Structures are given as structure tokens and as C-alpha cells.
């Protein structure tokens, strides 16, 4: 080998060594590289509040756990993010996306932390969390009957600020005030006004989305296909939602509620249930009559602890007490509703009554409770949901209720919400959420518990109920709801860029015939599948474009 050839070979080897070393450093230190990249977009200013946390920060675990609503996912073995970004403006979101792409981190976007499977803050591969807690402004314009809501706001904040501006307006979102609007709206979002006004997603008229290239898009610039997709198809599949523009709805100055408990043997509860399932979805849209069954631990006459099951029937009626009592006595006399069972409340007070975070009868509360993001007790839980299209036979419902007595239940509950009303009139393709005409009610099964070591036992109990009810619920496919995400339906490999065949199995359960349109939108908006998780919408493989 001559000298010049040797020199060239030596130089090439040195270059290759340094390139390899740099690549190894890049792979070994994605956290440091993310911080370096972020500082290039957003120069560090010590005067600004801290909004980036790494595993070396004292507040890291506090920030991470603060909005994890399901205590199943707070164990030491739960995968943790390398970085948590808590943006205070859109530029922080843009930098988070661009830097995550650059250093090879996946992104999980968290609004309120209620994801049933924890996918808004858990990944099996290296990841960063974009936690939107600091972006929670609600700007209400009563003149146009609209509001811009940042995606980190909670439902409680939305209801509170609308009510502050005008108590005759509200928004048709869910019951739980600590749920974040980022996920709730983008998955559909049902609640007390569903039979009047449809879902939360049916009442969204604009949005700000930060896409895979870090660009901020509104409805006009994103186009109608992408705007359609983020309202019920899961916004996290297409980018990060920064804000929603919502259409306010009119509510009466007073509404009437009742919530009655029925403590009787199972056959008596089933008789009431059967009457409920025959009529609840047929009522005028001004009445939402729900029911739920739950376990209670009581002490019998001999001082022994035992489990019993109580039934509860609860209403929200957009009218007066006399009208509601008259309606119930004519249509559902078995329930025995009396005037003394009812309360006439302002709309905001009905929201608080059904919020689950206060005891309305004993608490000295104000509507400011809706602003408390930590209201309510956190537990570990598991949940599955079904849609019912035909009456469940009484004999079957007896056996379903009997499962609440099984030892593995923890605190078990079945909750049933009637559909019908305007839900029957909205096309199943209006937004990606397809569960409209033909759905009588939704039925969900849940167990809650305290100890981490009991996780598997109680999760398996919920699975056993779900398996038992198979013949009595929707079929071919068995329908599901994105906001009650269920990884038992199937999951894709988040490291794999193309998972269409796998994803179709669960995608058609969530979205029905809308799944293929979502895939086409994804293929155009995020062809390399940067925004992905175990149940994300996949793009089509390149040869299928």
C-alpha cells in the first residue's frame, strides 16, 4: 500500500469513527439532544416559568403523576417519558414536535390524563409527553354564541366560563369536570345534552392543529377532510390540537333532576331495568334518564360484611318538576317518582350535581369546584363499553347482575346511557364517530380498586363480564368507543410504520365504515406515521397510495 492510499484509508477510518461515535451519542442521549434542539427553537430565559422536565428534575415525578387519573399506571414499572414539556403557547408545541422527530422520540399528548389505557402518557418506546395543562384559556363570545377553548382546558373550566358569561348557554360535553377537552372532543364526547345536541365533536366549528411539520393549521388551511377526522377520529393521530372553536347551545334557566336508589333483590332490579331499556331511548330529547348498578359493602343484622347490589335511576329534564313527575308516572310508574324526589336547579348546578366530585346534599360548594383539576378521588380502574341494539332478555340480565357478586369484582359498576333523540338524526359519517341510529343505549362495565397488586384480578373480572355479554350486544363488528379505549380489542406495534391490516380489526369497531376514510386522511396528513401509538390510525403503505 502506498503512502497516499494509506493516508486516504486512515482519514476515512477516522471520519467513520467520529460519525459512528456521534450517532451512538445521539442514540444514547436523546434527552440531551432534545433539550439542545428545543433551546435552538425556544431560547432559554431564566425569567420564564419552567416548562420542561427531565428525569433529573426534582418535580419530574410530581408533574408526571399529577394528572394520571388511573392509578394502575403509577407503578415503578410503568414506562416513563424522557422529557415532559408543559407548553404555555403554540411555539412550544411546534418545537416539541420538530425536536421529537429530529432525535427519534415518539410523542404522547396529554390534556386531562383520563385515557383509559394510559396512552396519553405511556409508550413502550422512548418518548416525550406534551402536557397541555398550562394551555387552558376559555374565551367566550356570547354575541356569536361561540368560544375558543385551548386543548388543555377541562370540561369543568369550559362549563364554568360559559356560565360566567351567560347562564342560559352551555356545551354538550361529558359529566366529569376534570376530563380534558383535548382528548374528549377529538374522540366524540357524550354527555347530558347528547340527546338534544349530539356529541361535543358535533358542535366544533374550527380548530388549531399543529401538524407533523410544525405548521399551525385552522379549518380553512387544513381542509375539510382533516377537520372531519379530528372530530371523533382521535386528534392525536394527526398532530397536536392546540385549541377548539365550539358552538354554544341554549339551556333553560332551570332543569329538573332526580336520582333515586333502588335496594331490592336482583329480580326486582331486572324488572325495572327491562322497563328502562324499553322506553329510555324513545323519550323526548329533553329527558335524559340513565341507570346504573353498583356493588355496596354493607353490614348485615348479624354484624357480618356482605356485598349487595343497588340500582340507581337518574334524570336530567329540560323542564319543570310537575311536567317530569307527570311524564314519569304515565310512562314509568314502577319507578314511583314523587315530587319530593326531584330538585329544580340552575343548569350549572345540575352539572355539579352529576359531576361525581361533590356530595350535593351535604357539601357546602360553589361552582368554583368546576375549576379544581384535582377534584374527586383517584383510584385504579378498568373499563369496557358496549353498544346495545336489541333488548337484553331479563334472564340474561339476571346473570349479568349476578356477576357483581363475584369475589374478584372490587367495586363494580354497570352504567347505561340511552341514545335516541337527535343522535338518531345525525348521519353515521357526519364525523368519524359512527354510533347513531339503531343504538338503543351504551352499557359500560367498570371495576375500581385501591391496591396495585390487585390489578390483574380486577381487570380479568371486567374482561369476564365483557365476554359474558357477547351475545347480547352489537355484533359484526362488536362496536366500541374511542374515548373508552380498550387495548384488548387489538393493538399495533408502535415501532412499525405500517399496520393497516392489524389496525382495521379494532378500527372498524371504533369507527365503522369511517375507518377507511380516516386512513386516507392519515396517509395525506402524516404519511410517515410519526403520530402513532398502539391504537393509532395507520397510513396506507407506500405502494397503496
From Swiss-Prot:
Pathway: Secondary metabolite biosynthesis; terpenoid biosynthesis. The active site is at residue 484. FAD binds at residues 109-115, 120, 176, 180-184, 190, 236, 241, 481-483. Its EC number is 1.21.99.-. Glycans are attached at residues 65, 89, 168, 297, 305, 329, 467, 499. Inhibited by hydrogen peroxide H(2)O(2) and FMN. Completely repressed activity by Hg(2+). Binds 1 FAD per subunit in a bicovalent manner. Its cofactor is FAD. Disulfide bonds join 37-99. Residues 1-28 form the signal peptide. One of its GO terms (molecular function) is FAD binding. Keywords: Disulfide bond, FAD, Flavoprotein, Glycoprotein, Oxidoreductase, Signal. It catalyses: cannabigerolate + A = cannabichromenate + AH2; cannabinerolate + A = cannabichromenate + AH2. Expressed in young leaves. Cannabigerolate binds at residues 292, 417, 442. There is a cross-link at residues 114-176 (6-(S-cysteinyl)-8alpha-(pros-histidyl)-FAD (His-Cys)). Oxidoreductase involved in the biosynthesis of cannabinoids-related terpenophenolic natural products, which have pharmacological activity. Catalyzes the oxidative cyclization of the monoterpene moiety in cannabigerolic acid (CBGA) producing cannabichromenic acid (CBCA), which exhibits anti-inflammatory, antifungal and antimicrobial effects. Can also use cannabinerolic acid (CBNRA) as substrate. Unable to catalyze the production of delta(9)-tetrahydrocannabinolate (THCA), the precursor of Delta(1)-tetrahydrocannabinol. Belongs to the oxygen-dependent FAD-linked oxidoreductase family. Monomer. May form homodimer. This is Cannabichromenic acid synthase.
Amino acid at each position: 500500500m502506498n503512502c497516499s492510499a494509506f493516508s486516504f484509508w486512515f482519514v476515512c477510518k477516522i471520519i467513520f469513527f467520529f460519525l459512528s461515535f456521534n450517532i451512538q451519542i445521539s442514540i444514547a442521549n436523546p434527552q440531551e439532544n432534545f433539550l439542545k434542539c428545543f433551546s435552538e427553537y425556544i431560547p432559554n430565559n431564566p425569567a420564564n416559568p419552567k416548562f420542561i422536565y427531565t428525569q433529573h428534575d426534582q418535580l419530574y415525578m410530581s408533574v408526571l403523576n399529577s394528572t394520571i387519573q388511573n392509578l394502575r399506571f403509577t407503578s415503578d414499572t410503568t414506562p416513563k417519558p424522557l422529557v415532559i414539556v408543559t407548553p404555555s403557547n403554540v411555539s412550544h408545541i411546534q418545537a416539541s414536535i420538530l425536536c421529537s422527530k429530529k432525535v427519534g422520540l415518539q410523542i404522547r399528548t396529554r390534556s386531562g390524563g383520563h385515557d383509559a389505557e394510559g396512552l396519553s402518557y405511556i409508550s413502550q418506546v422512548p418518548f416525550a409527553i406534551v402536557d397541555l395543562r398550562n394551555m387552558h384559556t376559555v374565551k367566550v363570545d356570547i354575541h356569536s354564541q361561540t368560544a375558543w377553548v385551548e386543548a388543555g382546558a377541562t370540561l369543568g373550566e369550559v362549563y364554568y366560563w360559559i356560565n360566567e358569561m351567560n347562564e342560559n348557554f352551555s356545551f354538550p360535553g361529558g359529566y366529569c369536570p376534570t376530563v380534558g377537552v383535548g382528548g374528549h372532543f377529538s374522540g366524540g364526547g357524550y354527555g347530558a345534552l347528547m340527546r338534544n345536541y349530539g356529541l361535543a365533536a358535533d358542535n366544533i366549528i374550527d380548530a388549531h392543529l399543529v401538524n407533523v411539520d410544525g405548521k399551525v393549521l385552522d379549518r380553512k388551511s387544513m381542509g375539510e377532510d382533516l377537520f372531519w377526522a379530528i372530530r371523533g377520529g382521535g386528534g392525536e393521530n394527526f398532530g397536536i390540537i392546540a385549541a377548539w372553536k365550539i358552538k354554544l347551545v341554549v339551556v333553560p334557566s332551570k332543569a329538573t333532576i332526580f336520582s333515586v336508589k333502588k335496594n331490592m333483590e336482583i329480580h326486582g332490579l331486572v324488572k325495572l331495568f327491562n322497563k328502562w331499556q324499553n322506553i329510555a331511548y324513545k323519550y323526548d330529547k329533553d329527558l335524559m334518564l340513565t341507570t346504573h348498578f353498583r356493588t355496596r359493602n354493607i353490614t348485615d343484622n348479624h354484624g357480618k360484611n356482605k356485598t349487595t347490589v343497588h340500582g340507581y335511576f337518574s334524570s336530567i329534564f329540560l323542564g319543570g318538576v310537575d311536567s317530569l313527575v307527570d311524564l314519569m308516572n304515565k310512562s314509568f310508574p314502577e319507578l314511583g317518582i314523587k315530587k319530593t324526589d326531584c330538585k329544580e336547579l340552575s343548569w350549572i348546578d345540575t352539572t355539579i350535581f352529576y359531576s361525581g366530585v361533590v356530595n350535593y346534599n351535604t357539601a357546602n360548594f360553589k361552582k368554583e369546584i368546576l375549576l379544581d383539576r384535582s377534584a374527586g378521588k383517584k383510584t385504579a380502574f378498568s373499563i369496557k363499553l358496549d353498544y346495545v341494539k336489541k333488548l337484553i332478555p331479563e334472564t340474561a340480565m339476571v346473570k349479568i347482575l349476578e356477576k357483581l357478586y363475584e369475589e374478584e369484582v372490587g367495586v363494580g359498576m354497570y352504567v347505561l346511557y340511552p341514545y335516541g333523540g337527535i343522535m338518531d338524526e345525525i348521519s353515521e359519517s357526519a364525523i368519524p364517530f359512527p354510533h347513531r341510529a339503531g343504538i338503543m343505549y351504551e352499557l359500560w362495565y367498570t371495576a375500581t380498586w385501591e391496591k396495585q397488586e390487585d390489578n390483574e384480578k380486577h381487570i380479568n373480572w371486567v374482561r369476564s363480564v365483557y365476554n359474558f355479554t357477547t351475545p347480547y350486544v352489537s355484533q359484526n363488528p362488536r362496536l366500541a368507543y374511542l374515548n373508552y379505549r380498550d387495548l384488548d380489542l387489538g393493538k399495533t406495534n408502535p415501532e412499525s410504520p405500517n399496520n393497516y391490516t392489524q389496525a382495521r380489526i379494532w378500527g372498524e369497531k371504533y369507527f365503522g365504515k369511517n375507518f377507511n376514510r380516516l386512513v386516507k386522511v392519515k396517509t395525506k396528513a402524516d404519511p410517515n406515521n410519526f403520530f402513532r401509538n398502539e391504537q393509532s390510525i395507520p397510513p396506507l403503505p407506500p405502494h397503496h397510495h
